[in-house]
Swiss-Prot record:
Residues 29-338 are extracellular. The chain crosses the membrane at residues 339-359. GO terms for cellular component: axon; cell surface; dendrite; GABA-ergic synapse; glutamatergic synapse; immunological synapse; inhibitory synapse; membrane. Residues 360-393 are cytoplasmic. This is Neuroplastin. Isoform 1 and isoform 2 are N-glycosylated. Some isoforms lack the first Ig-like domain which may confer homophilic adhesion activity. However, they can bind and activate FGFR1. PANTHER family: BASIGIN RELATED (PTHR10075), NEUROPLASTIN (PTHR10075:SF108). Probable homophilic and heterophilic cell adhesion molecule involved in long term potentiation at hippocampal excitatory synapses through activation of p38MAPK. May also regulate neurite outgrowth by activating the FGFR1 signaling pathway. May play a role in synaptic plasticity. Also acts as a chaperone for ATP2B1; stabilizes ATP2B1 and increases its ATPase activity. Promotes localization of XKR8 at the cell membrane. It comes from Rattus norvegicus (Rat). Residues 366-393 are annotated as: Disordered.
Length: 393
């Protein structure tokens, strides 16, 4: 072997050796965490969720374990439906493994250390193996504190009366220092309500359906999670927006909608007037599509038929307090309708031309037939002149 070929052969050998050490597409890969659970502090009655995301080849198995406070070595496995069905475990496996642990209606006994374990070791469930070697772990500490006691006024139902309404909250007991408090409606903070007070009031001077919803008095503390209480203000639906009429051409699509205020959110229903009576729409043709979103509903009709779809449509909103209905008139024109203005103009032009032609024919005088040249007085005068000249001679 020549000296020049020796380094090349050596490099090729090293490349083959190093290539054999690199993991291929189907090579095994140890489990590793992409996302680990995070520690939280909660109040009794609240809920928490812990997330765990792991990778590896093959996809690692995920388990959840729990240990009480100050007993970190006494872990017990958590199963879906445990603790009187307050525990929910949802796990999905694909290119990686993802699991969510959720516990609701928390009690003080739910405090402790929660552990996400993952492993793709073939012997991971062998009792003779040391779990600390075959499983990787990620821990989170959940601290559950006693929720402060908040006394609230009763729920309110808005009727036709416009008498003022006052909502009240009173923080009667708390082991933590209050920072500030405020009111929210449907999750949005109400302006000019933030203050440092345990007794809170919110006044609605002229209550209407649009004032209904979920009101919360929210308390923030120095070293504890915020606490809140709910007061429901209810009202019958009041439909505030809809189309009075909809004009479309045959073959087009039509969309009718209704918006309402009121709480609780209503159940929506669409009906069409048949023989003077509103009847619920039956989607036998498959051309009707209804979308309901809390205080909004939408009726879509595709490929309008001039013989079936025109008429009066009604949207109805109903909740536990009352109901409301409004109507929309749908008109469907023939697909030739866009040509009607053009045809009308063309007809007017034709009629105008005919009138002009007839008028011109009647206005023209009768034509005189040709009768040859006519004799004039000048000819006679010439004859008379000649006669005089002869007489003189």
């Amino acid at each position: 072997m020549s000296g020049s070929s020796l380094p090349g052969a050596l490099a090729l050998s090293l490349l083959l050796v190093s290539g054999s050490l690199l993991p291929g597409p189907g090579a095994a890969q140890n489990a590793g965490f992409v996302k680990s659970p995070m520690s939280e502090t909660k109040l009794t009655g609240d809920a928490f969720e812990l997330y765990c995301d792991v990778v590896g080849s093959p996809t690692p198995e995920i388990q959840w374990w729990y240990a009480e406070v100050n007993r970190a070595e006494s872990f017990r496995q958590l199963w879906d439906g445990a603790r009187k069905r307050r525990v929910t475990v949802n796990t999905a496996y694909g290119s990686n493994g993802v699991s969510v642990l959720r516990i609701t209606r928390l009690t003080l006994e739910d405090s402790g250390t929660y552990e996400c374990r993952a492993s793709n070791d073939p012997k991971r469930n062998d009792l003779r193996q040391n779990p600390s070697i075959t499983w990787i772990r990620a821990q989170a500490t959940i601290s559950v504190l006693q929720k402060p006691r908040i006394v609230t006024s009763e729920e309110v139902i808005i009727r036709d009366s416009l008498l003022p309404v006052t909502l009240q909250c009173n923080l009667t007991s708390s082991s933590h220092t209050l920072m500030y408090s405020y009111w929210t409606k449907n999750g949005v903070e109400l302006t000019a309500t933030r203050k440092n007070a345990s007794n809170m009031e919110y006044r609605i001077n002229k209550p209407r359906a649009e004032d209904s919803g979920e009101y919360h008095c929210v308390y923030h503390f120095v070293s504890a999670p915020k606490a809140n209480a709910t007061i429901e203000v209810k009202a019958a639906p009041d439909i505030t927006g809809h189309k009075r009429s909809e004009n479309k051409n045959e073959g087009q699509d039509a969309m009718m909608y209704c918006k309402s205020v009121g709480y609780p959110h209503p159940e929506w229903m669409w009906r069409k007037k048949e023989n003077g009576v509103f009847e619920e729409i039956s989607n036998s043709s498959g051309r009707f599509f209804i979308i309901n979103k809390e205080n909004y509903t939408e009726l879509n009709i595709v490929n309008l038929q001039i013989t079936e779809d025109p008429g009066e449509y009604e949207c109805n909103a109903t909740n536990s307090i009352g109901s409301a209905s409004v109507s929309t008139v749908l008109r469907v024109r023939s697909h030739l309708a866009p040509l009607w203005p053009f045809l009308g103009i063309l007809a007017e032009i034709i009629i105008l031309v005919v009138i002009i032609v007839v008028y011109e024919k009647r206005k023209r005088p009768d034509e005189v037939p040709d009768a040859g040249p006519m004799k004039t007085n000048s000819t006679n005068n010439h004859k008379d002149k000649n006669l005089r000249q002869r007489n003189t001679n």
